[in-house]
Regions:
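Active-site neighborhood of phospho(di)ester-bond hydrolases with catalytic His/Asp-centered motifs
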Residues: 89-92, 118-131, 142-145
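Short, solvent-exposed loop/turn segments at secondary-structure junctions
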Residues: 97-100
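Short, surface-exposed beta-strand-loop junctions and turns on beta-sheet-rich folds
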Residues: 174-176
């Protein structure tokens, strides 16, 4: 699908000025992903078992996560960004935090990785149409409201970025945020 959408790969990053935008693929490891008979199927099974052990409430068939390979790529990329003094925004389909019925299967591992780097300024996600917001070790994590269930109301946000400020201007039922 990503090729049909002219995306460079399943997960990727791009740089604009002193900002790096990282697009995670939280649909990579999922019940609906084409992973049967591959090493990713083992990762799926491992994630499900770990979630059951911690009594996580997000081990549902509509959620997904990222592979160990993608996690290693993310860690290497963040390390480079930190070293170069760049600022980073993270984007994913599934919420990373706070935990909900719609969270990424390995969201805890992802936010632990993000929190190691001061270059990460915020993370944005969707999937949970009600929206959500939380801080994880000083990183704002924003789940943007959806518009699927709101036929007569729109929801989108415009993000304005400057050297020392991040402004999320919610429209319709979308929330607004401001971060320094």
């Amino acid at each position: 699908l990503y090729k049909q959408l002219s995306m460079p790969s399943e997960y990727y990053s791009f740089k604009k000025g002193d900002w790096v935008f990282i697009m995670l693929n939280t649909n990579e490891i999922a019940s609906y992903a084409n992973i049967a008979g591959t090493p990713k199927e083992n990762e799926w099974n491992r994630m499900q078992e770990q979630i059951k052990q911690i009594k996580g409430k997000y081990a549902y068939e509509w959620n997904g996560g990222i592979s160990e390979k993608q996690m290693q790529w993310l860690d290497r990329l963040l390390k480079k960004c930190e070293k170069k003094g760049l600022s980073v925004l993270i984007f994913s389909h599934h919420p990373l935090y706070p935990q909900s019925d719609f969270s990424a299967l390995n969201g805890n591992e992802i936010v632990d990785t993000l929190s190691k780097y001061s270059c990460v300024k915020a993370a944005f996600s969707g999937h949970h149409h009600a929206g959500a917001f939380g801080y994880y070790k000083n990183i704002p994590l924003i789940t943007l409201e959806g518009m699927v269930e709101t036929e007569n109301q729109n929801a989108y946000a415009i993000v304005e970025i400057s050297q020392d400020h991040l402004l999320v201007k919610g429209q319709g039922r979308a929330s607004s945020y401001s971060f320094k």
